[in-house]
Swiss-Prot record:
This is Tetratricopeptide repeat protein 38. The lineage of its organism: Eukaryota, Metazoa, Chordata, Craniata, Vertebrata. Keywords: Repeat, TPR repeat. InterPro entries: TPR-like_helical_dom_sf, TTC38. It comes from Xenopus laevis (African clawed frog). It comes from the Eukaryota. SUPFAM superfamilies: TPR-like. Belongs to the TTC38 family. The gene is ttc38.
Length: 469
């Protein structure tokens, strides 16, 4: 990416995005933070996101938007929870107090309110507040990115797409980072099943900036959803040098690469990717995206009958630290996979019991309100599946299969639960469940033709129960 000119106070004002500080250095550091967030890359020449935010705070500790960015990024990362993290909770209070002690623009006030609302667990309302900002300030990249990520956590696929579509015309080709906004739009198109259009838009973004790892990620998804494995593998290999430097997303792109290999049944190659890239990057970063990718990959391999050795025991050392965070049900389910895989019964019990406790009085916490009817049954289904109680696993997952979208994540990520349901139904002693598995396999085969994984599952069904058709 060509070096971008960092905006000073006047440049922000000229863009209609006035910042309440008199420090040009702070304005430039804030811009540097946004650039790194948008490009999924901690840039050492800019000091990394953490370095930029630290310098902002040292230079102008009263700069509210610095606190908004710092707290918002922590919350959106979902790796720290104000429920159990006093330092984060104190930082949020500092932000709120500062916002009340000085004159701010209406846009800045809305940013503070949105971060406070997200911290309180009311994700839909937080998204609405970021949308209010975008209605008046369509080039506010922080509001756009926060809204995009929030919709992703809510499973609101159309909103994720349309939120970007509403502002995209304001991002002219000469506007810095406009191609990255186009890449965001490509992902929304993908998640709403406009695969060909998503591919076209992602390629347009990559034609401007080939290191745009989010657009690479969109294309990886398209090949995954179409089971076009050879094209996916070729694309990964040909572009690896372009995206592997995006430290905040590279692990996830390698995870997509590994999904192709698992789909093909090339488990050794998948484990090699895990050991060489996916696990090391997770242990280095500790980021939630990397953590859930590690859990998901090991679980998928285990469902395929692969012995993953001590890898679960290594991973649970990270996941058990987040047992009582309860930021997202999606995260909790992946922590549970890790504790089950490592046979850590105490951590499993703590996770489930603390979830159940929070479900009793969720208040405005949107994720906690989903525990009783969605999170708890899914957790119990994984526990039953792990114990070989396939009948119970099916009875828990099948009634809510069309609600699983609400836990957030992508279609590719949530496909794990489709696979659990099918595997459990195949292995069930119930004739009813076996018949369910048969029709689910037919559904899957039509929706994703030429999938080797589906063909393996069909052969497994036929080996146990006779011809499928």
């Amino acid at each position: 990416m060509a070096p971008l000119s960092l905006r000073d106070c006047k440049a922000w004002q000229d863009a209609g995005l006035t910042l309440s500080t008199t420090s040009n250095e702070v304005c430039k550091l804030f811009d540097a933070t946004l650039i790194q967030y948008a490009t999924w890359k901690n840039d050492s020449t800019l000091g990394g996101i953490e370095g930029c935010l630290s310098r902002i705070n040292n230079t102008d500790p009263n700069f509210v938007m610095g606190h908004v960015a710092a707290n918002g990024l922590e919350l959106i990362g979902t790796g720290r929870s104000p429920l159990v993290d006093k330092e984060l909770d104190d930082a949020l209070k500092t932000m709120s107090d500062l916002s009340k002690s000085q004159a701010l623009t209406e846009r800045e006030k809305l940013h503070v309110a949105a971060v406070e609302t997200f911290a309180d667990g009311n994700l839909p309302k937080a998204a609405d507040l970021w949308e209010r900002i975008l209605q008046s300030h369509p080039t506010d990249l922080l509001a756009l990115k926060f809204a995009h990520d929030c919709y992703f956590y809510l499973g609101e696929q159309r909103q994720m797409r349309d939120s970007v579509a509403r502002v995209l015309p304001y991002w002219k080709p000469e506007t810095p980072l406009s191609s990255y906004v186009k890449g965001m739009y490509s992902f929304g198109l993908l998640e709403t099943n406009f695969y060909d259009q998503a591919l076209k838009v992602a390629k347009e973004a990559l034609a401007v900036e080939r290191t745009d790892s989010w657009s690479v990620h969109t294309i990886a998804h398209v090949h995954e959803m179409k089971a076009d494995l050879d094209s996916g593998l070729s694309f990964m290999q040909e572009t690896e040098n372009n995206w592997k430097g995006s430290d905040m997303l590279a692990c996830h792109v390698y995870w997509h690469w590994a999904l192709y290999l698992i789909e093909k049944g090339d488990y050794e190659a998948a484990l090699t990717l895990y050991d060489n890239h996916i696990a090391p990057q997770c242990f280095a970063s500790g980021s939630m995206l990397d953590v859930v990718d590690n859990s998901s990959m090991l679980y998928r391999l285990q469902m395929e009958g692969v012995n993953v050795g001590d890898r679960w025991k290594n991973l649970v050392q990270i996941t058990k630290k987040h047992t009582k965070d309860h930021m997202l049900i999606f995260n909790d389910l992946h922590f549970l996979m890790s504790s089950l895989g490592s046979k850590d019964e105490d951590t499993t019990r703590q996770l489930v019991e603390s979830m159940q406790e929070l479900s009793k009085s969720p208040g405005e916490k949107q994720q906690h309100s989903l525990i009783k009817h969605l999170g708890a049954p899914l957790c119990q289904a994984l526990i039953e599946y792990n114990g070989g109680n396939y009948d119970k696993a099916v009875d828990l997952i099948y009634p809510i299969r069309y609600q699983i979208l609400k836990i957030g994540g992508s279609d590719a990520q949530r496909d794990l639960f489709n696979q659990v349901l099918i595997q459990a139904a195949i292995n069930s002693d119930s004739t009813h469940h076996q018949n369910l598995a048969r029709v689910l396999l037919m559904e899957r085969d039509i929706g994703r033709p030429n999938s080797p994984l589906t063909q393996r599952l069909i052969k497994k069904w036929e080996a146990l129960h006779g011809l499928l058709g």
